[in-house]
Swiss-Prot record:
Described function: Catalyzes the condensation of carbamoyl phosphate and aspartate to form carbamoyl aspartate and inorganic phosphate, the committed step in the de novo pyrimidine nucleotide biosynthesis pathway.
Name listed for the protein in its UniProt record: Aspartate carbamoyltransferase catalytic subunit
Source organism per UniProt: Prochlorococcus marinus (strain NATL2A)
UniProt KW Transferase keyword: yes
Subunit: Heterododecamer (2C3:3R2) of six catalytic PyrB chains organized as two trimers (C3), and six regulatory PyrI chains organized as three dimers (R2).
Enzyme class: transferase
GO molecular function terms noted in the UniProt entry: amino acid binding; aspartate carbamoyltransferase activity
HAMAP family per the UniProt record, alphabetical: Asp_carb_tr (MF_00001)
Ligand binding (L-aspartate): 87, 182, 253
Gene3D superfamilies xrefs: Aspartate/ornithine carbamoyltransferase
Pfam families found in the cross-reference section: OTCace (PF00185), OTCace_N (PF02729)
TM regions (residue ranges): none
InterPro entries, per database record: Asp/Orn_carbamoyltranf_P-bd, Asp/Orn_carbamoylTrfase, Asp/Orn_carbamoylTrfase_sf, Asp_carbamoyltransf, Asp_carbamoyltransf_Asp/Orn-bd
UniProt similarity note: Belongs to the aspartate/ornithine carbamoyltransferase superfamily. ATCase family.
Length: 339
């Protein structure tokens, strides 16, 4: 763990191959703890972790809460409905309140892009010993989801020893609303870092052509890419072409709440063209796993029958793997906290 240099986890674009290896190794260990009878480690005993979710969440917030408790941390959950935001307090003042209370790690989800990054910059400038963990910001990033998806796939391809090598030269297809998906962006960084070839598929309104260059250059303000050679990214408009020879398929929810008018004609047409079903999976020419980060819109991006077919979909595995993955991140951020 001596190679871990991050005081915050904001975006997977900054992760080196060693960072991915560290997280996958720790996640494997913590998964055994999560499944054991004791289910707890004293690693973060006495540390305060605050979950500040300014957007609705079920899986991610609960997963972070359980992860923190598995590490014996004290946990404080923020609720918008019962907060002083209703009295006119700004989100920044709410967050600063938790910092003043001595929170060691703030897990933050916000509808606006870069809120976690701006907060990380604030605590660094003011020499505050608090780490920021991005639990999803706007369209930008959802690093813990990208990492748990990476672990889920690595475990599927190599159950005995999941690692970054488990993804090397694998063909992963991501289908759906790429434009509005922070999950897709985080998966692009993670999968290509580990040598996977990623094919994106969706209508032009939800998958602009510029996504083909998404991982070619670091984000604004980042001087270099810590990955020497990434896997390739392709765009296919035809689902049949995209699924050909795929080793795994991820389908994404249509984020209607983020869409402008007329971005889609109708949901029935979308399902016919891009819905993942048992029939469309035959284009892969072999049995492949299907992932979905949730929440699922049955009969829109994935068939009801496929959602309930646990011999093919890894949806429950993704939820299960979320806890040890987030344990790994919290543990790494909590390692160097001063008493």
């Amino acid at each position: 763990m001596n190679n871990w240099k991050h005081n915050h986890v904001l975006d997977l674009s900054t992760f080196s191959l060693e960072d991915y290896k560290t997280v996958l190794e720790l996640t494997t260990r913590f998964k055994d703890v999560h499944k054991s009878s004791s289910r707890k480690l004293p690693a973060l005993h006495g540390r305060l972790i605050a979950n500040l979710f300014f957007e609705p969440s079920t899986r991610t917030r609960t997963s972070f809460e359980l992860a923190a408790k598995r590490l014996s941390a004290d946990v404080q959950n923020f609720s918008v409905s019962s907060s002083s935001l209703n009295k006119g307090e700004t989100p920044l003042d709410t967050i600063l309140t938790y910092i003043s209370m001595g929170a060691d790690i703030l897990v933050i989800r916000h509808e606006s892009t870069n809120v976690p990054a701006e907060l990380a910059n604030y605590v660094d400038i003011n020499n505050i010993n608090t780490s920021i963990l991005n639990a999803g910001d706007g369209f930008h990033s959802h690093p813990s989801q990208g990492l748990l998806d990476l672990f889920t796939l690595a475990t599927f391809f190599n159950p005995n020893e999941p690692s970054t090598n488990s993804l090397l030269n694998k063909k992963i297809t991501i289908v759906g609303d790429i434009l509005h998906s922070r999950v897709a962006r985080s998966n692009l960084w993670a999968l290509t870092a580990c040598g996977a070839e990623v094919t994106l598929c969706g209508p032009p309104s939800l998958l602009p052509e510029e996504f083909i260059d998404f991982v070619q250059n670091p984000p604004l303000g980042q001087n270099f890419d810590p990955i020497n050679k990434r896997g390739s990214v392709f765009i296919k408009r035809s689902l049949k072409d995209a699924l050909k020879n795929s080793d795994a398929v991820m389908t994404l929810r249509l984020q209607k709440e983020r869409m402008k008018q007329n971005m889609l004609t109708d949901l029935d047409s979308y399902y016919v063209q891009y819905g993942i079903t048992h029939e469309s999976l035959k284009w892969c020419e072999k049995k492949v796993p299907v992932l979905h980060p949730g929440p699922v819109n049955r009969g829109v991006e994935i068939s009801n029958r496929l959602v309930e077919d646990n011999s093919i979909n890894l949806i429950s595995k993704q939820v299960e793997n979320g806890i040890p993955t987030r344990m790994a991140l919290l543990y790494l951020l909590g390692l160097n906290k001063k008493d």
